[in-house]
Amino acid sequence: MITIIWSLCLIFCLSNSILVIAKDLCLPDQRDALLEFKNEFSIPSPDSDLMLILQTTAKWRNNTDCCSWGGISCDPKTGVVVELDLGNSDLNGRLRSNSSLFRLQHLQSLDLSYNDLSCTLPDSSGNFKYLRVLNLLGCNLFGEIPTSLRSLSYLTDLDLSYNDDLTGEILDSMGNLKHLRVLSLTSCKFTGKIPSSLGNLTYLTDLDLSWNYFTGELPDSMGNLKSLRVLNLHRCNFFGKIPTSLGSLSNLTDLDISKNEFTSEGPDSMSSLNRLTDFQLMLLNLSSLTNVDLSSNQFKAMLPSNMSSLSKLEAFDISGNSFSGTIPSSLFMLPSLIKLDLGTNDFSGPLKIGNISSPSNLQELYIGENNINGPIPRSILKLVGLSALSLSFWDTGGIVDFSIFLQLKSLRSLDLSGINLNISSSHHLPSHMMHLILSSCNISQFPKFLENQTSLYHLDISANQIEGQVPEWLWRLPTLRYVNIAQNAFSGELTMLPNPIYSFIASDNKFSGEIPRAVCEIGTLVLSNNNFSGSIPPCFEISNKTLSILHLRNNSLSGVIPEESLHGYLRSLDVGSNRLSGQFPKSLINCSYLQFLNVEENRINDTFPSWLKSLPNLQLLVLRSNEFHGPIFSPGDSLSFSKLRFFDISENRFSGVLPSDYFVGWSVMSSFVDIIDNTPGFTVVGDDQESFHKSVVLTIKGLNMELVGSGFEIYKTIDVSGNRLEGDIPESIGILKELIVLNMSNNAFTGHIPPSLSNLSNLQSLDLSQNRLSGSIPGELGELTFLARMNFSYNMLEGPIPQGTQIQSQNSSSFAENPGLCGAPLQKKCGGEEEEDKEKEEKDKGLSWVAAAIGYVPGLFCGLAIGHILTSYKRDWFMRIFSCFSSPLKK
């Protein structure tokens, strides 16, 4: 009994000791380091109970056990902090290299994601020699990755994603992190090539390098990553062929290499059509794949006829390439396939789906915009689970009865654009149809069967022959949000009822009257190329806080652009070719997302809006043919158009001198940069929002060329023609190496043509005509191989026209009215050429006299000798002939 009592006492004492130890587990130096680290940042006071819960550090207090604090885990034996999880904890400040954080040297996991650290990654980060997990996602880091990270030899997870200003190249030494399993660097600004040392990370299972600015090809060493399951290289600027070594990644389940410039050998490079290409072999070897996205590249291969080895495939997207040949029927037999997107390729021939015996799991099928022909196979109706179907621009060779598609009862999205349809008003769509796209279907009447649709979300009936007015019942459809009726023959006044439409596109019709006030709540409004009159509705000023796209070009609108209608989310504004007047709206300075701005051919009277340079995303600015005046540069103006691709201020009354460094800082025109658009909130299902339905006129040598969609992005242009600019052409123009079109004609520029123009290696059109330029045409311009159009006429240039195929192929009118110019293609010879021609002529004359003399002397001797022979021997035949000529004389 005594023994039992003593045992119970011992257990009680030990348990109390353990509790005491547990209570005092936190080491003082660890607690102090944590509290000091917290005080290094500004943390807003929680304004609600929810914020109090979210702020992990809110209950950190001195004289309490730090191992019980939120976000903290300690080693149960030593009491050191081994895990610090402060993700999304409202930390605002700068993580310094001497931060108390680095005193927690036993950390194994550090998560500071979604805080504002506003710093370069300190070299001290390499001091965490036991660190296994480092998560700095979305921390506003900038600069380059420090080399000290190579010291984190135990690291298994590294996430530096969504740090928009994290730059430089991926370090070759990152290949030393041989225990790494997860590496995520998405949405940064990394450049350069992928180091081959990345192939040393043989334990890597997840690699995400998407949304960066890399260059070059993928290294063959990527094939060493045998454990890799997820590979995401979306939008990285890679090019070239995919290494065949990737075919050995047998564990790969998710592959996304979309939106790059990867290529593959096409059918023409195959010695035999029976031989599988390297690309086909690589694809078939990846038998564990479940998700494949190869879209928006430059692949030209044919798909293998038998793809049954990819039995686990659930999603297969190769859209936006140049795949050719027939679509293999084996694709439709894959048992797990849910999504198949083969759109926008060069597939041809009839579609053969094959005999589908078992129920198909296929839910999404996109095969539009190819070269498929022949009748639509009835076997497509066996895909009873289809919820989305796109067969756009299928050459059926005749009229297709719309009713056959109504048998697919699960359809929610249907795109039959470009197919000649027979539509009856008695048709009944499935009640859950959400997206219906019937563009270019030869429809002549508004589809009345839409009147009772209760789920329709997106309707596109553009590019048909529908006449009359838009039926009022359209605006009563309860779920309708996106409407495109452009390129029809709708007429009369546009009668719209108040509704929650997000996007309304009605350009290229015959609407007239005033723009109805009901449009004021719309986020995307495109009414270009109609006959609207009156003013821009003033309701925009007070109602619409979500307007993102406003296109009203080529109407008869008058008045001013409403000053208060332009809010922060505006992304594209085109009111060109109207009768608008007044001043340029200064409220545009609030539109930080603005990319496309066109007010051409109006009557706007104002000075140059230099404050537009503060808009960080502006890519196109067109002020052409207005009444703008004054200088386009002001002293002290240090800003530049960093992302501008198209700059047209022609046909105004701008004046003044441009400083020599005026074009410094025009980054996109200076170097090749593929702008990645991370602007949130503009995705629209089924509508090409990227193009904004943009249209801009480019003038080259008097000819107008309309750039539609993304054309302005390709033709990087500066047009300042038809103004009163004077002084020298800025020498800094030579920085803009990506410039395609440069027009500075019809101004008062003086001085010499800057030799730096020869640096514009991509220039295709150059117009400097009708200025007061003097001196010679720089000879280096003759070496610009793409310069197909040029005009130097009506200046005061002199000297020889440079040699070069492109220059010599120009019409002489391109150099006219420059009295001092000479040489081809002008008729006027240069001074040196005239002397050379004269010397050559004199030399030729001398040679001819010498030749005559050389011929005369032997001829004389020869003649005398022959005469002597003839007169001495007097042959009978000679005397008879001679006597015939001489006898008349004797008479």
Swiss-Prot record:
InterPro entries in alphabetical order: Leu-rich_rpt, Leu-rich_rpt_typical-subtyp, LRR_dom_sf, LRR_N_plant-typ, LRR_R13L4/SHOC2-like, RLP23-like
Residue windows of the LRR repeats: 105-130, 132-152, 153-176, 177-201, 203-225, 226-249, 250-272, 286-309, 310-334, 336-358, 359-383, 384-407, 408-436, 438-453, 454-477, 478-504, 506-519, 520-544, 545-568, 570-591, 593-614, 615-641, 642-665, 712-736, 737-760, 761-784, 786-809
Signal peptide as annotated in the record: 1-22
GO-annotated cellular components: plasma membrane
Location of this chain's protein in the cell: Cell membrane
Pfam family, one: LRRNT_2
PROSITE patterns associated with the record: LRR
Extracellular compartment spans: 23-849
Keywords assigned by UniProt, alphabetized: Cell membrane, Glycoprotein, Leucine-rich repeat, Membrane, Receptor, Repeat, Signal, Transmembrane, Transmembrane helix
Bilayer-spanning residue ranges: 850-870
Major localization listed first in the record, in broad terms: membrane
Glycosylation site residues: 62, 98, 200, 251, 285, 306, 355, 422, 442, 452, 531, 544, 554, 590, 605, 743, 759, 791, 811
Topological relation to the membrane, as annotated: Single-pass type I membrane protein
Side of membrane Cytoplasmic, spans: 871-891
The family this protein is said to belong to: Belongs to the RLP family.
Protein name: Receptor-like protein 50
